[in-house]
Design a protein with these regions (language model features):
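Short, solvent-exposed loop/turn segments at the edges of extracellular beta-sandwich modules
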Residues: 372-378
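Extracellular interdomain linker/stem segments of modular secreted and single-pass surface proteins
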Residues: 388-392
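Short, surface-exposed loop/turn segments at beta-strand-coil junctions that are enriched for proline
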Residues: 355-361
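Hydrophobic/tyrosine-rich beta-strand signature of extracellular beta-sandwich/beta-rich modules
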Residues: 367-369
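Surface-exposed loops/turns
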Residues: 306, 321, 346, 361-362
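Surface-exposed, flexible coil segments in extracellular/virion-facing regions
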Residues: 331-355
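N-terminal acidic, glycine/proline-rich low-complexity segments
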Residues: 1-311, 315-338
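Extracellular and select intracellular beta-sandwich modules with Ser/Thr-enriched
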Residues: 378-385
Length: 392
């Protein structure tokens, strides 16, 4: 902790260990048994789907008198007079969230319940337990990201050399303190091997891509993948698809929405593990990317008319370690509605220009700025601008 604290970005200190321990709450001891793929409990998405586990029925853990420390804590957070969204990353099972929302619905007025539920932003990795099914069926109004294949992109896509045992030993497990030494082996078919799995990390990484994404816009994509509306009447989102350069299989196009960022994620992971044991002068830190004079970490937007020349710059971008920086501008096609090509002049420099294309109706294009340093490991920072092209 003392070493990590020395690497904290100004204004964003690492929380004290005791603070983290104080907010860990015990949840329901739901019993789940691994079976085989497709042999577990029924799930509503995809159609006729089944999980890979058996699980206690939801009635055992949701209802009157079934509150846990965890569910009570969630209710307490929702009852606070706080306008901010409450993000809930679910990767171990949402039964306590199900109990919390049962209590919200049964112990509060309809208006208070509606207001509390509207604050929730919920990322669900796979189905995990029967509580996830119950929430889907009973709370369709929840802002929910339901990952089927997206979250698997962290271990199915990208350079294999960034997720094998040799990489883990060199960058995480060995000579990286107590945290690195505790990295778990992945189990499969009774075998335990040291490899990057991180299959549930998407639910957290989704919130950790400042400048690249906006968590409130699942269709835009980012470090935790990209999603699309499940239907036109709810706030539920399911796997989207990006063109995968290695495969046109549906699941591989979904995993690629996360996998396309894997090299940057792996290098960031390695750098942070170095922070555990190295002083700031010996470790690498990410660049601070500026976009058109904006030093914040928000996504920018601009509306331009067809035929108008657009000039964008990364001037002002800095690196904490004074490393040499390289730049790359590129069109992230899938989130936008513009379906053509954009000619980017200077796409490998700090400034880029393009001409807004002719369109018959307004269309959007997502332009990404990547800034990568020359340190070890090489770290990348992102900015995004959403351009809306309008007719003349």
């Amino acid at each position: 902790y003392p070493s990590l604290r020395a690497h904290a970005r100004e204004g964003f200190p690492y929380p004290e260990p005791e603070k983290l321990k104080s907010i860990v709450k015990r949840g329901a001891p739901v019993i789940r048994t691994w079976l085989r793929a497709g042999n577990g409990f029924s799930v509503p998405y995809p159609a006729d789907g089944r999980d890979s586990r058996s699980c206690d029925p939801v009635e055992k853990w949701v209802g009157e008198g079934k509150a846990t420390e965890a569910s009570a804590h969630l209710v307490q957070l929702l009852e606070q007079d706080d306008p901010r969204p409450l993000w809930i990353a679910v990767w171990g099972g949402p039964m306590d969230l199900a109990q919390a929302l049962w209590q919200v619905r049964h112990k509060h007025s309809a208006e208070a319940s509606r207001r509390m539920i509207s604050r929730i932003r919920y990322y669900q990795v796979s189905w995990q337990d029967t509580g996830a099914v119950w929430l889907w069926e009973n709370f369709p109004e929840l802002f929910r990201l339901q990952s089927q294949f997206v979250s698997r992109g962290i271990y199915r896509e990208g350079p294999p050399a960034l997720r094998d045992e040799a990489w883990l030993r060199a960058n995480v497990v060995e000579h990286h303190g107590a945290l690195g030494a505790s990295y778990p082996a992945a189990g499969a078919n009774g075998k335990h091997t040291l490899q990057v799995k991180e299959g549930d990390s998407a639910s957290f990484l989704y919130l950790l891509a400042p400048g690249l994404s906006d968590p409130n816009e699942p269709e835009w994509g980012g470090g935790g993948g990209r999603f699309r509306h499940f239907d036109s009447t709810s706030s539920r989102f399911v796997d989207a698809r990006d063109r995968n350069p290695s495969s046109d299989e549906v699941d591989r196009e979904s995993t690629w929405t996360m996998g396309r960022w894997n090299e940057a994620i792996a290098n960031d992971f390695a750098a942070r593990m170095n922070w555990c044991v190295q002083p700031p002068s010996a470790a690498n830190h990410p660049p601070v990317a500026h976009l058109d004079g904006d030093a914040s970490r928000r996504v920018l937007r601009r509306t331009v008319r067809a035929g108008e020349t657009i000039a964008l710059t990364a001037a002002g971008t800095t690196d904490p370690d004074r490393d040499r920086l390289t730049y790359r501008w590129w069109l992230y096609s899938e989130p936008g509605t513009f379906e053509g090509e954009l000619r980017l002049e200077g796409q490998d420099t700090a400034s880029v220009t393009l001409v807004a294309p002719v369109v018959s109706t307004p269309a959007t294009a997502h332009l990404i700025l990547e800034v990568t340093d020359s340190g070890q490991p090489r770290l990348t920072s992102y900015r995004r601008i959403v351009l809306t092209f309008t007719p003349r």
